[in-house]
């Protein structure tokens, strides 16, 4: 009888103190979207140019072009990433032998971690001191990156230590 009471207490505690960073397993509870600022370790910030996410140095009146990253946490370290109020989502897309980062017109709050077709939108966050890296959940080993050169597209790399790509970002809640 004691075991049943303990089981009920554990269930009650888990229900009362559920993680606020994870969505309901069935995807029925709407997740809270949060806005973050992101910039790489070379101080390049994200902005949209010709419907493509790029990283560069914005100064003066151009600082208004900065794109905030919209985040919907789905597990403690896994999240969906988007821009424009969560209406454009970052996706890891396989095309033949190539893996690319694309922006797709999808509402971030409609995504569901349990749907295989939504996995391309999920990224795993790795914090290392003050910096953060993002690995694609759909394409393990592929990381969000910027180029050393300014005003180049944000992309993905499977060589995160390559000198020509930057995979470490500062990621701060707005």
Swiss-Prot record:
Organism in which the protein naturally occurs: Bos taurus (Bovine)
Signal peptide residues on this chain, from the entry's feature table: 1-23
PANTHER family assigned: INTERLEUKIN-1 FAMILY MEMBER, INTERLEUKIN-1 RECEPTOR ANTAGONIST PROTEIN
GO CC terms of this entry: extracellular space
GO MF annotations, alphabetized: cytokine activity; interleukin-1 receptor antagonist activity; interleukin-1 receptor binding
Free-text function comment from the UniProt entry: Anti-inflammatory antagonist of interleukin-1 family of proinflammatory cytokines such as interleukin-1beta/IL1B and interleukin-1alpha/IL1A. Protects from immune dysregulation and uncontrolled systemic inflammation triggered by IL1 for a range of innate stimulatory agents such as pathogens.
Protein name: Interleukin-1 receptor antagonist protein
Lineage: Eukaryota, Metazoa, Chordata, Craniata, Vertebrata
Disulfide-bond pairs as recorded: 89-139
